[in-house]
Structures are given as structure tokens and as C-alpha cells.
Amino acid sequence: RQRQMCIRDRDNTFGGFLSPDDKSLYYVKNDRILLEVNLTTLAEREVYRVSDDWVGYGTWVANSDCSKLVGIEIAKSDWTPLNDWQIFHDFFHKGPHCRLLRVDLRSGESQVIHEEKIWLGHPIYRPFDDHTVAFCHEGPHDLVDARMWLVNEDGSHVRKVKAHAPGESCTHEFWVPDGSALIYVSYLKGQQGRTIYRFDPESGVNEALMTMPACSHLMSNFDGTLLVGDGSGTPVDVKDTGGYSIDNDPWLYVFNVAEKRYFRVARHDTSWATVANSRQVTHPHPSFTPDDSAILFSSDKDGKPAVYIAKLPAHPSMLSA
């Protein structure tokens, strides 16, 4: 059964998430108001409101038990709606005043964790460890100093995950859902392929797992034994698109980390276009179903952005990395 949760304009396209008990939906409205929707009654409760001098930015992410979240706010005086990739590039050079904060989902109380005059994004609690928060220095991947950072929840011990090598870009970091590692993708100027890396937050060691076709986004199953990625073309979020030119790839891939092999699942055939002033609604952002039997992804292959499920083949044709 399909139900529409909200009917008004300016709802955050990506920020919605469900509570673990499936009783509540949380989302951000107008870049400012965090709302909780009761999925039984559809009643809305305002959890948190961004102050007038700030604007809520990007995706806000809850901890494992959904008792609090981390998010990014940008000073209103620096804010520009990021409606296309040229504005994305220009905004990086502005050096906007940003702050990483946490919000209690019950009381609505907030606390600033980290603050800089640099573009911050992609905040993520480490699963099952509220003490550790990942965030990024946002912007064109070939211009940022170092993309991935960790900070303790109390604001102490800010540390970078990886120092970039010359010509290296790193992107789309995520925590393995069991909290064991941070996984990300590295790619080098002038090369078609990409390398999947694993960062151990306890030891601080970065380990190259395997090479892969050029994918825009990666996600793993619960324990990180399988990864899924969406084949892509030349990245739009770099300054030197000529130096990072790659062939377009319309496939969804699953990667077996232990075997260092992978297989194709299905074509996503998305256009990667900006739609309704949103830069990412056509991006596949694939993920596994809870039982690892299928892939959930987005595409506009049939005209408008929609969500699809592709079942994993029973006998896949494995390819070597």
C-alpha cells in the first residue's frame, strides 16, 4: 500500500529516514524545520528548527538507535541554493561558515560539535558508536585538501582519514552498517579505474580492498562482505573534467570483497540529469535489501526519477578485479 507522507513544497529530497521500529519518519522542510511524522496517525511534530541566521544543509543522519542525529548548518549570509553543478563549484571557493551539530530527537536540544570557515558536509555517526562522527570537506574532489574527517562527538580529536596523494580524489565514504570500518573510493587523474579502500577507525589504517569499474556511489551489506556500486561517467564534481574523463557505464555492480571479484546485476540507465533544481534525484544510490537478495536504486530511465528493485542473479557471471 502506498501513502504520501507530505504534500507541501520544499521538502528535503534526501533527508528522510525511518526510525528502527518503523513508527516514525523524520525529514527536513524548507532547509530549516526537522519534522517527525507518526506513520500511524500521520501527525507531525516539530523536533528542531534552524535559527534564522543559519540554513540546514544536506542529509541529516541519525545514530543507530535513532535517539539523535548529526547535521550541517551553513551561515545564511554565505548560503546559495546549490541548484546546479556550476554553483557547486563556485560555492567551494566562497569558504562558507559551516557547523556540524547534533540534535536530540526527543527534546530537540542541539549542540555544535565542530565549526569552520570551510564547506562541510556528509555527517555520519559511526554505527553503534555515538562517540565517533565522520564528516567531509565538501567541494570539487580534485580541489579539496582532504575530503574525509573524523571527530569525537564532544568536538575533540579532529583527525583526517586519509591524506590525498597527488592527483588523487576520494569520494562517497560510508560506514559499514555494523560499524567495523569506513569504506570509500579513490581515483587518480588520467585513470579509468577506481580503488575501493577500507579505513579501520580503531587502528587508523587504510587498506586497499580491490579495484572496480568507475562507480559514482558505493554501499555495503551489513557486515561489508558485499558492496554495490552504480557505473557512471566523467564525474561532474571535479574541476578538471578533462583530466578525469571516463567512459559512461550504465550498469549496477556487486563486489565480493573476499574474492576480489564482481558481477553485473542490471542496467540502471539513468541520465544523471539535474531535475527540479535537485542535483542528485537521478543518481542511482544503490543499496542492498536487508536479506542481500536484491538491489534498491533510483533512475529516470522511464522518464521521471523513480525507485526500482533488481534481484541478484542466482548464478552470476563473475569478473576479476
Regions found by a protein language model. Give the residues of each.
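Short, small-residue-biased leader/transition segments that mark boundaries at the very start
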Residues: 2-7
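Repeated scaffold domains used in trafficking and secretory/extracellular systems
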Residues: 11-17, 54-61, 120-124, 168-174, ...
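Residue-level detector of Asp-centered blade-edge/turn motifs that repeat once per structural unit
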Residues: 20-21, 64-65, 127-129, 177-178, ...
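Hydrophobic beta-strand positions that form the internal "hydrophobic ladder"
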Residues: 25, 69, 132-133, 181-183, ...
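Asp-box/WD-like beta-propeller blade repeats and closely related beta-sheet repeat scaffolds
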Residues: 30-99, 108-118
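Short, conserved, GDST-rich strand-edge loop motifs in beta-rich repeat architectures
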Residues: 71-95, 136-145, 187-189, 229-249
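Conserved blade-ending motifs and adjacent loop-strand segments that build the rim/top face
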Residues: 209-219, 260-287
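Blade-level signature of beta-propeller repeat domains, shared across WD40, Kelch, NHL, RCC1
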Residues: 282-321
